[in-house]
């Protein structure tokens, strides 16, 4: 067996490679072999898949992003805008027949007119919100300062006063009435300002007017005593 193995010096052993270079440089190291698995396929580094590189289509051209649809803006003339604004003032939501009739008058397509009405309604809502936004911060007391004060309006309601009870004058029965004579002098009417201070009336009640002034006694000359 050993003779057969020696007779085939040029046939390397499977899975093992002898390193003669190390033996020549280091003879004292003895027989030194390195184990190399030659049956395993050589490893290769896979390239990174598309990192930082543009992608190419199978046809060979570079793949481009799908560009967005370009919007075409329609320019309206002054006559067309006047007709559209007039129709918008009459009806903000025209039907298909009204839009087709307006399209014949203005020379525009029905789709353009429909888009114009949508934009016009959105513009009007935005204007209304901008007008109402400053008024939302004002308090109700601020609004009352701008309103004119009227003494009595057609819808103003006032509370009726309490019923007035009339009390007799406290001095109306204190003095008996005396007959009037021809030679009497009428006293001037006294001021009634003193009456509420001397005789305050209860709350919700007013006193009766004072009685007529009493006539003084007769000023005839006294008869002599005979």
From Swiss-Prot:
Belongs to the paired homeobox family. GO terms for molecular function: DNA-binding transcription factor activity, RNA polymerase II-specific; RNA polymerase II cis-regulatory region sequence-specific DNA binding. It comes from the Eukaryota. Residues 31-41 have a biased composition (Polar residues). Pfam families: Homeodomain. InterPro entries: HD, Homeobox_CS, Homeodomain-like_sf, HTH_motif, PROP1. Keywords: DNA-binding, Homeobox, Nucleus. This is Homeobox protein prophet of Pit-1. One of its GO terms (cellular component) is transcription regulator complex. It is found in: Nucleus. Residues 29-73, 178-226 are annotated as: Disordered. CDD domains: homeodomain (cd00086). Residues 216-226 have a biased composition (Low complexity). GO terms for biological process: pituitary gland development. The keyword DNA-binding applies. Possibly involved in the ontogenesis of pituitary gonadotropes, as well as somatotropes, lactotropes and caudomedial thyrotropes. Residues 64-73 have a biased composition (Basic residues).
């Amino acid at each position: 067996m050993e003779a057969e193995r020696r007779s085939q010096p040029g046939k390397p052993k499977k899975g093992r490679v002898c390193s003669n270079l190390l033996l020549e440089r280091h003879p004292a190291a003895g027989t030194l072999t390195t184990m190399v698995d030659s049956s395993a396929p050589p490893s290769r580094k896979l390239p990174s898949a598309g990192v930082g590189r543009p992608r190419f289509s199978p046809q060979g051209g570079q793949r481009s992003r799908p560009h967005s649809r370009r919007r075409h803006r329609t320019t309206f003339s002054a006559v067309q805008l006047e007709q559209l604004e007039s129709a918008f003032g009459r009806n903000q939501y025209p039907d298909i027949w009204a839009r087709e009739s307006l399209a014949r008058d203005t020379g525009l397509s029905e789709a353009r007119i429909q888009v114009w009405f949508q934009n016009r309604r959105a513009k009007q809502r935005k204007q209304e919100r901008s007008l109402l936004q400053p008024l939302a911060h004002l308090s109700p007391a601020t609004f009352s300062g701008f309103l004119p004060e009227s003494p009595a309006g057609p819808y103003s309601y006032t509370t009726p006063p309490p019923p007035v009870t009339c009390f007799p004058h406290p001095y109306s029965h204190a003095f008996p009435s005396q007959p009037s004579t021809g030679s009497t002098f009428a006293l001037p009417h006294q001021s009634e300002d003193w009456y509420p201070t001397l005789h305050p009336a209860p709350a919700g009640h007013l006193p009766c007017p004072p009685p007529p002034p009493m006539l003084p006694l007769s000023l005839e000359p006294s008869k002599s005593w005979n």
